[in-house]
């Protein structure tokens, strides 16, 4: 029987990213600021461990794309607004949507499965189904969003010489 989650390091990194987003929101900071602060502290305090590089990547990615991520989540909430969601659910959804849009090495089903698993571990009994439903809707539009982003990047680079 194969392990459903062969990369426990990534799972823990995602969980830590959710923790950082939750903490950042509570403190009125960005996730990138909290990650930077934590890693600086790890450099001076022997009892503080540096963050997994993937946690930092996710924190910075969510910070850089937060408005777009929140707009996309909000567009797929039915009967809810983003600010009415439990803070942990917002953090889980933000991590997962960032992965769906920007983590090219993470298959879409893995991003969704990981988010659902985090919702089971960290949130209410209703959250896993809710998170799965929202991300299922977001997954329907991610190919178009990724293609549009790629086209913008290519046009910004200008015509290739050849």
Swiss-Prot record:
Pfam families (alphabetical): NusB
UniProt keywords, alphabetically: RNA-binding, Transcription, Transcription antitermination, Transcription regulation
UniProt entry tagged with the keyword Transcription regulation: yes
GO BP terms, alphabetized: DNA-templated transcription termination; transcription antitermination
Annotated Gene3D superfamilies: NusB-like (1.10.940.10)
InterPro entries xrefs: NusB-like_sf (IPR035926), NusB_fam (IPR011605), NusB_RsmB_TIM44 (IPR006027)
GO-annotated molecular function: RNA binding
GO CC annotation terms, alphabetical: cytosol
Its biological purpose: Involved in transcription antitermination. Required for transcription of ribosomal RNA (rRNA) genes. Binds specifically to the boxA antiterminator sequence of the ribosomal RNA (rrn) operons.
Similarity comment text for this entry: Belongs to the NusB family.
Protein name: Transcription antitermination protein NusB
Gene name per UniProt: nusB
């Amino acid at each position: 029987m194969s392990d459903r989650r062969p990369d426990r390091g990534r799972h823990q990194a995602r969980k830590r990213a959710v923790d950082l987003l939750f903490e950042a929101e509570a403190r009125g900071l960005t996730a990138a600021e909290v990650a930077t602060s934590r890693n600086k502290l790890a450099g001076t305090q022997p009892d503080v461990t540096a963050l997994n590089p993937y946690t930092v990547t996710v924190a910075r990615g969510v910070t850089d794309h937060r408005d777009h991520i929140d707009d996309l989540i909000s567009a797929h909430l039915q009967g809810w607004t983003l600010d009415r969601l439990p803070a942990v659910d917002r953090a889980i959804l933000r991590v997962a949507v960032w992965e769906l849009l920007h983590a090219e090495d993470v298959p879409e089903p893995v991003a969704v499965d990981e988010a659902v698993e985090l919702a089971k571990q960290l949130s209410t009994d209703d959250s896993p189904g809710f998170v799965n439903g929202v991300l299922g809707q977001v997954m329907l539009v991610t190919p178009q969003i990724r293609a549009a982003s790629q086209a913008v990047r290519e046009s910004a680079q200008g015509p290739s010489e050849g």
